[in-house]
Each structure stands twice: as C-alpha cells, then as structure tokens.
C-alpha cells in the first residue's frame, strides 16, 4: 500500500513536471510575466507564480484552491484536472472577452485576478464548460512568445520615439538657425541706413559753415562801408556858433534875484530871444566831430567880455 501511494505521488509529480514543460504553462497564467511557475490552482487548472498564489489564497477556497507543485502531495483527481485544463484552455474561458495577449498592469495585478475569477467579468459562458469543448485557435501562440513580441514592440516603439525626438530636435535646431540668420540679416539691414547717413554727414556739415561765412562777410561789409561825409552847410553852422559869445554866469548879474532874468522878455526883443535860443537848436552836425561844438556855458576867464554882452546884461530896457 505504502509503495503504491508513493508511486502514485511520484507519477503525479512527473505528470506535473511534464505539464510545466508545455509552452503556455511556462509562464504564470495571471500576471504573464514570471516564468517557471511553481504553484497551481488545481480547481481552476492554472499554473501561477508565488505572488499570484498569495492573491488566490485571499480569494478563498470557494474560488481558488492553491497547492505547491514541489512541496505538496497531489492526488490523481487534482493531477487529472490540471491535465484537462492548463493555462491555455483556462484563459480561453476566463479571458474570452479580453484582447489576445493581454498583459495586466503590474501595480493592479490583485484587482485583475479578483475581477477575473471572482466577478467573472471576461468569461466566455456563465457556466464553466467542459475543457474538451474549448478548442484553442490554430494561430494562437504561447504566452512566452507573446511576451517576446511585446518586448520587441516596446523596444521598437522606444527606438522610434527616440528617432522622432532626434528628428524634432534637429528640426527645432534648423528653425532656430534660420531665425538667427533672419535676425542677423535684419540687423544688417537696419544698420545700413546708419552707414548711409554717416556717409552723408560731411555734406550736412559744410552747409552751416557756408552760412557762417556768408554771415561774417555781410557783417564785415557793414563795417567796411564808407563813413558819411559832413555837408558844407553843417560846417558853416558850426563855425557860426563858434563865433557867437557864450552867456555869462549868474555872478555878474544885478543885485536883484536872478538879475536881468527877473522880468520876462517882451515881443520887441526878438533878437535877444533868438540869440539865447540858438544854442538849443539841433543842427545837422553829426557825432563824428564832437570837438567842433562849443560848450553852452564858459567861465569868464576863458575869453574877454564883449561890449555887446555888457549891453545885454546891463540894459534894463532890452527885457521890456
């Protein structure tokens, strides 16, 4: 009996090892990442990794019953169920509504397993059918090959993204260089009028100098004009005024206040009035000969008193 039981265990272990050599059973049925799974849910008929086995245990034995391939002993019923199902047929039923080769997110693996087996969201039928009725498609590939193709696709996408980034950076560099060239051309075009204005500056400088020369010549012409000549009549008038006697000072008058000027002159003495008015007239004499005019009042010591002056001063009848 003991030998038969031990032989059964050994035969069951050999069957499980042979099942693990199949392509679809080399990768975990749930996460599809970890290879060489050493755990299994015998009622569901799937081989899983140690991480997913912990999630299966949390679902409860009414959903999944987990055993170790190496450490636990397997019965004939358990081994037969694993032989009937396997990862390929199990996923054909439990993931029927998912896209082929779907790989769940590593951070949401627990939610994925719970939704897959407990809520039965992606099952093919509400009732679990016989595994022999589930025929895998001819063009289906093992999960390991799918993962390899996914890795290749990811690498190609990353390389294409890198090439796109390099192309975009090269385009940006070209655009930047073009903008710099345009800005340099614009700056040169803006600086060219300044150069033209610099070349025209000497002509603008000569114009004020010419005007200054004209102004200086006009001023010099004014100063260089001949001085006006004094007419002969003005010279004769000056000589006449020089020969006339000058009025005497008030010291030789009478004892009365203001002397002979106390009474106003009558109309009959027109000669005296005209005589005293003569020095007050303005003649044609210019300021060019200031020394020709005699001072209106001179002292008694400058020249001798004439008889006419004494008559004018001492004669009282003249002022009547």
From Swiss-Prot:
InterPro entries: ARF_GTPase-activating, ARFGAP/RecO, ArfGAP_dom, ArfGAP_dom_sf, ArfGAP_SMAP1-like. A zinc finger (C4-type) spans 28-52. SUPFAM superfamilies: ArfGap/RecO-like zinc finger. GO terms for biological process: endoplasmic reticulum to Golgi vesicle-mediated transport; intra-Golgi vesicle-mediated transport. One of its GO terms (cellular component) is cytoplasm. Residues 13-132 form the Arf-GAP domain. It holds the Pfam family ArfGap. Residues 154-176, 245-257, 295-310 have a biased composition (Low complexity). Residues 153-212, 227-261, 284-320 are annotated as: Disordered. It comes from the Eukaryota. One of its GO terms (molecular function) is GTPase activator activity. Keywords: Cytoplasm, Golgi apparatus, GTPase activation, Metal-binding, Zinc, Zinc-finger. Residues 183-210, 228-244 have a biased composition (Polar residues). It is found in: Cytoplasm; Golgi apparatus. GTPase-activating protein for the ADP ribosylation factor family. This is Uncharacterized protein C824.09c. It comes from Schizosaccharomyces pombe (strain 972 / ATCC 24843) (Fission yeast).
């Amino acid at each position: 009996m003991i030998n038969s039981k031990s032989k059964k265990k050994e035969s069951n272990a050999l069957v499980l090892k042979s099942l693990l050599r199949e392509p679809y059973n080399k990768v975990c049925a749930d996460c599809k990442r970890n290879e060489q799974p050493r755990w299994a849910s015998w009622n569901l008929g799937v081989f899983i990794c140690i991480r997913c086995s912990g999630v299966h245990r949390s679902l409860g034995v009414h959903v999944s019953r987990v055993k170790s391939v190496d450490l636990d002993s397997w019965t004939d019923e358990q081994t037969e169920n694993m032989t009937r199902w396997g990862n390929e047929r199990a996923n054909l039923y439990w993931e029927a509504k998912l896209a082929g080769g779907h790989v769940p997110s590593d951070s949401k693996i627990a939610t994925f397993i719970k939704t897959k087996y407990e809520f039965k969201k992606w099952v093919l039928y509400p009732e679990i059918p016989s595994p022999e009725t589930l025929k895998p498609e001819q063009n289906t590939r093992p999960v390991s090959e799918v993962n390899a193709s996914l890795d290749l696709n990811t690498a190609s996408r990353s390389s294409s993204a890198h090439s796109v980034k390099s192309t975009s950076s090269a385009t940006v560099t070209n655009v930047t260089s073009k903008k710099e060239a345009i800005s340099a051309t614009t700056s040169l075009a803006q600086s060219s009028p300044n150069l033209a204005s610099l070349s025209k500056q000497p002509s603008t400088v000569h114009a004020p100098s010419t005007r200054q020369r004209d102004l200086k010549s006009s001023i010099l012409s004014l100063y260089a004009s001949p001085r006006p000549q004094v007419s002969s009549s003005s010279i004769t008038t000056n000589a006449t005024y020089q020969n006339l006697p000058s009025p005497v000072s008030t010291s030789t008058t009478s004892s009365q206040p203001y002397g002979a000027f106390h009474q106003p002159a009558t109309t009959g003495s027109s000669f005296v009035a005209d005589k005293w008015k003569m020095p007050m007239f303005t003649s044609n004499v210019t300021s060019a000969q200031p020394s020709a005019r005699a001072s209106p009042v001179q002292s008694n010591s400058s020249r001798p008193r004439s008889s006419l002056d004494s008559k004018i001063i001492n004669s009282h009848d003249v002022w009547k």
